[in-house]
């Protein structure tokens, strides 16, 4: 999927009408008192790491739309989705007011999309980091050329409520989980539906409630993991849509399912569960649990090949913490963030962790 114009211009696109807007540098704002407290409260318990440096701030700033009818009460738009580029220090964040922002390594930011519908998922492509796939709460799936902000193509899902999105490693397939209990797999080149996993009627046949997390196994292109509000984790062979593993476990209410090697993570909305770790070779009970005392809304493994670090974020205690599956306690992070943490992602090298919160700020951890 190649864009017509591959130059790195600064054109920003709102719907289909490109306009020229200067890139905004957001390095100037100073930390608020709350953010200063967060920085000084950040804890590193992991001496094996040479450094863990917390930096906040990529504060939400809207250079174009001063008046937002969706943002009643004057609150900052919330960050619901984050994706970090494979081989560059570029981060995409999706907001509750429909904006998508791109941040580069120089801490510049530009707006590339404004849909006025909440962005619930987005992914920068693995094979071409100039393309981003996003989905809105009303089912608009869009492929965007990041440097220019131009839409490459889009399609709309009708009569269903999407909750989550993931891309295959080759970026040729999009998987979407729905509030109605369905999972749909689309061809990303033709924007056509290829596979449909219907709502289950029993434990053995699928989900019976909202699906909030679906993820392709990046080491096995035929495998998919899903989790939902029905407290079920399911493993799927997408070649024949066969359910090859199932367990009653975490109550998944956000993007809290991930897989790495034989290990499967499930972050739970129930504070007593925290984050549960499973081994797919004996997929019956969790092999370990990690206490958080919070409602977990995001959970991801580090993408570095030779470690098994993961991070989780949520609310109640408004935390973001990172864990090593071989250690008992968290290794770095903090409680008492200014607002709930709804989304996070690691860079491919595992040296950057970005997480987004309900106050519109994108926080960064250099590892």
List each model region and its residues:
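Intrinsically disordered, low-complexity acidic/Ser/Thr/Pro-rich linker and tail segments
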Residues: 1-90, 94-101, 264
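Loop/turn-rich, solvent-exposed surfaces of beta-rich toroidal or solenoidal domains
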Residues: 267-270, 289-325
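Conserved strand-to-loop turn within each blade of WD40 beta-propeller repeats
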Residues: 94-97, 135-138, 177-180, 188, ...
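Surface loop/turn motifs at the tips and blade-to-blade linkers of beta-strand repeat domains
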Residues: 71-74, 112-115, 155-158, 203-206, ...
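Blade-level signature of beta-propeller repeat domains, shared across WD40, Kelch, NHL, RCC1
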Residues: 343-367
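Canonical WD40 repeat/beta-propeller blade segments in eukaryotic WD-repeat proteins
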Residues: 76-84, 116-125, 160-167, 202-217, ...
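Short coil/turn segments that connect the beta-strands within blades of beta-propeller domains
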Residues: 87-89, 129-130, 170-172, 219-222, ...
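WD40-repeat beta-propellers
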Residues: 100-104, 141-146, 183-188, 233-238, ...
């Amino acid at each position: 999927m190649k864009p017509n114009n591959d130059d790195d211009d600064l054109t920003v696109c709102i719907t289909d009408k490109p306009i020229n807007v200067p890139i905004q540098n957001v390095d100037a704002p100073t930390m608020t008192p709350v953010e200063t407290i967060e920085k000084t409260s950040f804890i590193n318990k992991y001496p094996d790491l040479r450094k863990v440096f917390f930096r906040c701030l990529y504060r939400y700033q809207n250079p174009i739309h001063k008046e937002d009818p969706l943002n009643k009460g004057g609150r900052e738009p919330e960050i619901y989705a984050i994706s970090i580029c494979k081989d560059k220090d570029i981060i995409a964040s999706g907001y509750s007011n429909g904006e998508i922002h791109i941040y580069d390594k120089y801490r510049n930011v530009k707006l590339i999309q404004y849909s006025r519908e909440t962005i619930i998922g987005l992914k920068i492509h693995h094979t071409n980091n100039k393309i981003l796939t996003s989905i809105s709460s009303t089912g608009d799936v869009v492929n965007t050329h990041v440097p220019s902000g131009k839409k490459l193509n889009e399609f709309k899902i009708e009569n269903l409520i999407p909750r989550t999105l993931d891309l295959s490693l080759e970026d040729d397939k999009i998987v979407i989980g729905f509030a109605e209990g369905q999972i749909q797999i689309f061809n990303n080149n033709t924007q056509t539906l290829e596979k449909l996993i219907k709502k289950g009627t029993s434990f053995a046949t699928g989900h019976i409630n909202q699906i909030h997390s679906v993820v392709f196994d990046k080491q096995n292109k035929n495998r998919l993991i899903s989790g939902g509000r029905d407290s079920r984790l399911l493993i799927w062979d997408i070649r024949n849509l066969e359910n090859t593993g199932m367990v009653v476990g975490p109550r998944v209410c956000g993007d809290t399912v991930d897989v790495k090697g034989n290990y499967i993570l499930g972050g739970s909305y129930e504070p007593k569960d925290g984050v549960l770790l499973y081994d797919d070779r004996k997929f019956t009970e969790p092999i370990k649990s990690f206490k958080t005392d919070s409602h977990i809304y995001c959970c991801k493994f580090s993408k570095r090949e030779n470690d098994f670090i993961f991070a989780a974020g949520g609310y109640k205690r408004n935390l973001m913490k990172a864990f090593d599956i071989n250690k008992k306690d968290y290794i770095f992070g903090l409680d008492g963030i200014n607002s709930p943490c709804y989304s996070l992602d690691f860079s491919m090298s595992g040296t950057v962790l970005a997480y987004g919160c309900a106050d519109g700020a994108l926080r960064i951890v250099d590892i």
